[in-house]
């Protein structure tokens, strides 16, 4: 998950090759859950010329999209432009094609003039751990400003309800409750998908708002272990940061009990992490 507000986020992303590898594996799992389709917006690929990926991280989503789109010539005969935007450059690739560009931008900050009305497609993914209540309205407005008329937003997101709340493990549910209470105390947005739909439907420059929900279990067992690993990492990392920040005596022992217990539950009971991933769409008028 990318972090747009690290001072309030449930967890942060560390620099380094190990973290890049984790983010790239997470990408593979998340795309698998949404039926291995990168592009869900109903848009003619030949009309997609300029693309922005907000919270881009390592840029792997842009790499994958380019592999999908580039065999298809653009309608105007120009090469595509791929822009990765993130509030931190820590994971930007050191080497990339000439038509790829990476820049620092926080989606909750005013849109630079040079980016307004520029893109045919703007993609966002996994900001659930970083947005306070009301932030989704700001993000949606800024995303709309990035688009040209007729362009699309595609936002792939988790929700606080199904993130870890349906997993049949007492230890996972304890961690889920701890994280939810922390987010509520900090005034963070627990249901980003619902907030997106509400904000996009109310936005005067957006239309054709939609939401599709994909389930981890229904995605099939091929990546079961990887799905479990990605979601368990998210759950345990969030828990660890909250416990460490609390200063509570015995926090380290409590984290060990919860994390090791959750892993044992999953292995012993053959659990397949039951959660939803939402694909949210909106088109600029």
From Swiss-Prot:
Q: Which Gene3D superfamilies match?
A: Vaccinia Virus protein VP39 (3.40.50.150)
- Pathway(s) annotated for this protein in UniProt: Secondary metabolite biosynthesis
Q: Which GO terms describe its biological process?
A: methylation
Which Pfam family would be a valid example here? Methyltransf_12
Kind of enzyme, top EC level?
Answer: transferase
GO function term, MF aspect, one: methyltransferase activity
Keywords tagged on the record: Methyltransferase, S-adenosyl-L-methionine, Transferase
Which purpose does this protein serve, as stated in its record? Methyltransferase; part of the gene cluster that mediates the biosynthesis of gregatin A, a fungal polyketide featuring an alkylated furanone core. The PKS grgA synthesizes C11 and C4 polyketide chains in the presence and absence of the trans-enoyl reductase grgB, respectively. The polyketide transferase grgF is then responsible for the fusion of the two carbon chains to produce the furanone skeleton of gregatin A. Next, the cytochrome P450 monooxygenase grgG accepts performs the oxidative cyclization to furnish the gregatin scaffold and leads to the formation of desmethylgregatin A.
Q: State the family it belongs to.
A: Belongs to the methyltransferase superfamily. LaeA methyltransferase family.
What name goes with this protein? Methyltransferase grgD
Organism from which the protein derives: Penicillium sp
Q: What is the lineage of its organism?
A: Eukaryota, Fungi, Dikarya, Ascomycota, Pezizomycotina
């Amino acid at each position: 998950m990318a972090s747009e507000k690290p001072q309030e986020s449930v967890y942060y992303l560390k620099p380094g090759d190990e973290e890049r590898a984790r983010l790239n594996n997470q990408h593979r799992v998340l795309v698998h859950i949404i039926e291995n389709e990168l592009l869900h917006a109903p848009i003619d690929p030949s009309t997609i010329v300029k693309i922005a990926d907000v919270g881009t991280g390592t840029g792997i989503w842009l790499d994958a999209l380019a592999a999908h789109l580039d065999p298809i010539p653009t309608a105007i005969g120009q090469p595509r432009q791929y822009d990765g935007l993130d509030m931190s450059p820590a994971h930007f690739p050191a080497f990339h094609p000439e038509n790829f560009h990476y820049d620092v931008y926080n989606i909750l900050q005013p849109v630079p003039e040079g980016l307004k009305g520029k893109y045919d497609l703007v993609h966002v993914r996994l900001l659930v751990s970083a947005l306070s209540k009301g932030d989704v309205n700001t993000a949606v407005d800024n995303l709309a400003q990035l688009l040209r008329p007729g362009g699309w937003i595609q936002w792939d997101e988790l929700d606080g309800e199904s993130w870890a709340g349906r997993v049949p493990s007492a230890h996972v549910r304890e961690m889920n409750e701890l994280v939810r209470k922390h987010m509520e105390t900090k005034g963070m947005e627990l249901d980003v998908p619902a907030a997106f739909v509400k904000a996009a439907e109310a936005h005067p420059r957006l239309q054709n708002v939609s939401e599709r929900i994909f389930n981890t279990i229904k995605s099939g067992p091929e990546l079961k272990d990887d799905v479990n690993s990605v979601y368990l990492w998210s759950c345990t990392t969030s828990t660890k940061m909250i416990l460490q920040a609390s200063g509570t005596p015995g926090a380290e022992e409590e984290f060990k009990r919860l994390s090791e217990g959750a892993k044992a539950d999953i292995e012993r009971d053959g659990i397949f992490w039951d959660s939803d991933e939402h694909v949210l769409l909106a088109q600029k008028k």
